[in-house]
């Protein structure tokens, strides 16, 4: 388990050091936005990797393979649409994220069932959980 914790800490450090990858010339035209697109231009300094240009997303920025894609808590992030899907989760290694399309009534049911089963719900705050449990 200590190896897992070490890798999670390493993942956090790498994330803090990782630059914010922005699209080439994002500051010149507001309509293109900052979302990452790889530069393909023939004379692009960013593509070539000139030091005074923005960073380009490459393999070296990836986190450790064993903890890649996990929630910062160390649990797998599983999307849940109903109580039936929630029951199938393993609370030791998986956590729930309630889908955006789920309404309030079903959301309350999911939170109550998750509390019974000891499953962590990532996208519902503690205040909301307390509110839902009191209903």
Curated annotation (Swiss-Prot):
UniProt keyword annotation of Protein biosynthesis present: no
An example Gene Ontology biological process: translation
Any single Pfam family the record assigns to this protein: Ribosomal_L32e
InterPro entries xref list: Ribosomal_eL32, Ribosomal_eL32_arc, Ribosomal_eL32_CS, Ribosomal_eL32_sf
Gene Ontology CC annotations of this record: cytosolic large ribosomal subunit
One MF term in the entry's GO annotations: structural constituent of ribosome
Annotated coiled-coil segments of the chain: none
Keywords attached to this entry: Ribonucleoprotein, Ribosomal protein
Family, similarity comment: Belongs to the eukaryotic ribosomal protein eL32 family.
Protein's name according to its UniProt entry: Large ribosomal subunit protein eL32
Native species: Methanococcus maripaludis (strain C5 / ATCC BAA-1333)
């Amino acid at each position: 388990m200590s190896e897992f914790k070490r890798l999670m800490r390493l993942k956090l450090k790498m994330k803090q050091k990782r630059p914010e990858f922005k699209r080439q010339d994002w500051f010149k035209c507001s309509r293109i936005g900052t979302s990452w697109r790889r530069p393909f231009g023939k004379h692009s300094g960013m593509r070539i990797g000139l030091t005074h240009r923005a960073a380009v997303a490459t393999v070296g920025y990836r986190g450790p393979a064993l903890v890649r894609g996990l929630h910062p808590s160390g649990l797998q992030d599983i999307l849940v649409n109903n109580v039936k899907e929630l029951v199938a989760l393993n609370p030791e290694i998986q956590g729930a994220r309630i889908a955006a399309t789920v309404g309030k009534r079903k959301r309350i049911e999911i939170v109550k069932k998750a509390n019974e089963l000891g499953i962590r719900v990532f996208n519902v705050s503690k205040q909301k959980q307390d509110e839902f449990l009191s209903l």
